[in-house]
Design a protein with these regions (language model features):
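Short catalytic/ligand-binding loop motif for oxyanion handling, primarily in non-cytosolic enzymes
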Residues: 36-37, 64, 110-114
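Amphipathic alpha-helical interface surfaces
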Residues: 81-85, 111, 115, 130, ...
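Helix-loop module immediately N-terminal to the HCX5R catalytic loop
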Residues: 50-102
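Histidine- and/or cysteine-centered catalytic micro-motif in compact active-site loops
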Residues: 32-33, 58-61, 106
Length: 180
């Protein structure tokens, strides 16, 4: 079971990998390919601390602005990326042992918070409860709707609408995307 989730940016994740804190026994990194050397170094350091680390490279692009971007289908989050993340998490969610999960992306705002919501929903929380929890651990959360759309399809539960509705209520101009 996943007990606690920590959301960080890449810099804080690197500090954790180099540090002596061993609170988190599983870690997911979702970053751009340009950060590959940092992530591979982190993986080695986390492994030496006994942390199971998984990483996925894709850009933090979403389709929530209502514009069709050709690069989304090659560089943005893909269904296979989200499937891989869910498949990585499943044994830890189903395990009777208590696990603490760390998640990072470059800024700790979009990809990582979406993954945190996915992990929380997999543990039995509703999407609303999951997002509420993630906002307490990462107040600047702005989850990637494309990732949540794919997760909704895989988990057969709507993770996207709660966050999409929340984004609509935020201060004017921050989210100007179209919803279809």
């Amino acid at each position: 079971m996943i007990n606690e989730i920590k959301i960080t940016d890449l810099s804080e994740a690197e500090s954790y990998a180099f540090g002596t804190n061993n609170k988190y026994d599983i870690w997911i990194s979702a970053t751009d390919e340009e950060d590959m050397h940092k992530i591979k170094r982190m993986k080695k350091l986390l492994h030496n601390k006994g942390v199971t680390h998984y990483y996925q490279f894709f850009y933090d692009w979403s389709d929530e602005d209502g514009i069709e971007w050709d690069h989304l289908e090659t560089l943005g989050p893909q269904l296979k990326h989200v499937e891989n993340i869910i498949n990585f998490l499943k044994p830890f969610v189903d395990d009777d042992k208590v696990h603490n999960l760390g998640v990072n992306c470059f800024a700790g705002v979009s990809r990582s918070t979406a993954i945190g919501i996915i992990a929380s929903v997999m543990t039995g929380k509703t999407p609303y409860m999951a997002f509420d929890y993630i906002k307490t651990v990462r107040p600047m959360a702005w989850p990637n709707l494309r990732i949540l759309r794919f997760a909704s399809d895989i988990l057969k539960q709507d993770l996207k609408t709660t966050i999409e509705n929340w984004k609509r209520t935020k201060i004017g101009g921050i989210y100007t995307g179209g919803w279809s």
